[in-house]
Amino acid sequence: MKFIPFTLSALAGGLVAALLVVMLLRPAPPADVHPVRRSPGEYYPAAAPVAETAPLPDLPAAAVDLRLAARRATPTVVHVDARVEGRDRATVKALFGREESSGTLGGEGSGVIYSADGYIVTNYHVVQAADNITVTTADRRRFPATVVGTEPKTDLAVLKIDARNLPFLELADSDAAEPGQWVLAVGSPLGLVSTVTAGIVSAKGRNLSLLRDPDAIESFIQTDAAVNPGNSGGPLVDTEGRLLGINTAIASRTGRFQGYSFAIPSELVKRIVDDIIQYGSYRRAIMGVEISSLMPADQQRLGLRDRTEGVIVDAIFPGGAAETAGLRVNDLIVAVDGRPVRDLPDLTEIIGRARPGDRLRMTVVRENKSRELTIDLLPAGN
């Protein structure tokens, strides 16, 4: 049995040699990758840094749970039934797209309770030309509603019912909304009351040329939450159950949802609705210009270097705020109060949310040089 010590010595020597070989042959980490210790004796390369425009909030590891948002939003959503009497049948059917077997003409949609004392927000096209409007709340109470005011250029309307202590939603900051975040659409699509659908924000600042007025304000939040006829006027809410927008339109070749729906952002809704409640109408501020999104032809015509976004000033109205501020035709507006202006919807929303008398700081590019101008907005009609 004397050979045992020699055997153990040989095994030990072999193990040491093997470890040395492994360590020598193991490739060193690249210079820009730092080993991170996971547990004693174990290392792995750290992931390469990812470029981010802003830090993201801590997100839960579990799947997104939208039940709380649905519980908060559903009681605040109403069904709006708008009926018309004594008008041309063909005209009204074209407006509302509905004719019941009883011969009654009208339309229906959704709305969201804006305040506990009975103010309700919906779309203008839901109640347009209606003589009798009935609102049904989530608990199946029915109320006659009156129109407080409308703003066709944004497709918004405010209704009032005689009720108190109604549930309503906190407003979300639509400026902070980002593509990829979860949202819910709540309403009465195809007559199915209190329907909740989910999706994500797909894009912001969409202009569909849906509203025919030349100075209409279109800067929609685009989502892929299913929205169908009857959803119009209902809320788009975030995962906290806060009002992020008013569902208004779908992009479809069939008249039914095909993956694209659009909502008026909450910050614009608040600005217009608060005016309607306080004054009976929206008090709009104007610049006194004609504007359009920057196009490749404009870049070439004006010799703009390294500029692919912004809004071109096409005309200036005499005596308007823009003329007083020193704005000129062919100026390229690229920012307002530090907020970037990519295209026409960005600027129309910014001006639409401003009030007459507000002073804005505009960054413009003129002859390839950036400059700051201060503009004092005037009320519409001046």
Residue ranges of predicted features:
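Short strand-turn-strand beta-turns centered on an Asx-Gly dipeptide
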Residues: 336-341
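Conserved catalytic motifs of ABC-family nucleotide-binding domains
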Residues: 330
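Serine-dependent protease modules
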Residues: 2-309, 314-318, 325, 344-348, ...
